[in-house]
């Protein structure tokens, strides 16, 4: 779950990390009033969306008058911002962040992720701030300095100082960086984050460090114990089908293809998508119904897949272990009866109660294509799409 920049900065402030004075505004009038609270210009106005690349898309601007602030707010509030990280529709803009402009001398990068290989929280710092860290990692990986947090000892001030020295910071900046490092590490651990970035972390012309931007992602599996973060969730920034799936504890990710996939198990789901691609098809989604699938969840999964207008056929691939194939069959029958299906449905059932599931589908009278293997299923669903 991602948060907006203004929400990330609110959390930064609570953990003792410096950020520009700013206000999130929902109307042009609020934006003008925010400028008055901040004081004399120039100011920076930023569209608040869950996507990078806002500046290049016109969603970030330095302005010198309140009239310009109003014009920016009127131009963007209620509209959609399209960046290289969004789809063609873009993301809706419901808030504008108005901040005091900062005199920048240098731009740095500081971020943290959970590294699965080491099973540790790993901090990354670089002198190449203001650009995508992925690009830096690809082109000049030697400019990224890493620091691993010991899960027993926790973050230590000396680790922050060590990173500061590697970034070429001196004097008071070393202490400032160490404080930001400790605040960010504490925030990461206490709030069950999956990712956090300050990009850029700037050195001002006065020699001070300020968190100029903030990107924060929470671990969705830990939200049950983070009620404050749950309240910050902006569902308007998420895919409607993905949000609906999450309510039913379904793992769904929308893709750009036209073959809907319903599978149990993340590994099998990825393998199913691969074999569909291998035979010339394009998956419309990743959907894992999980091991504890019920008839109701399977029905809802089917409805979510069919709510995508791009879907021209559906492939159901179930290996019955924990989940019973006859329950999957009941869910398919229930979904078809409730929603109505006008696209071909290819079903491959193997394992626990597969014969009973196949019999239920055959007796239902539904127009379902039975597959004998995963390869057969992929070939049949690709052929079904090609014939439409």
From Swiss-Prot:
Q: Which PROSITE patterns match?
A: ATP_GRASP, SUCCINYL_COA_LIG_3
Write out the GO biological process terms. succinyl-CoA metabolic process; tricarboxylic acid cycle
The name of this protein is Succinate--CoA ligase [ADP-forming] subunit beta
Write the gene name: sucC
Q: Which reaction does it catalyse?
A: succinate + ATP + CoA = succinyl-CoA + ADP + phosphate; GTP + succinate + CoA = succinyl-CoA + GDP + phosphate
MF annotations from Gene Ontology = ATP binding; magnesium ion binding; succinate-CoA ligase (ADP-forming) activity; succinate-CoA ligase (GDP-forming) activity
Keyword vocabulary terms for this entry: ATP-binding, Ligase, Magnesium, Metal-binding, Nucleotide-binding, Tricarboxylic acid cycle
Query: Quaternary form?
Result: Heterotetramer of two alpha and two beta subunits.
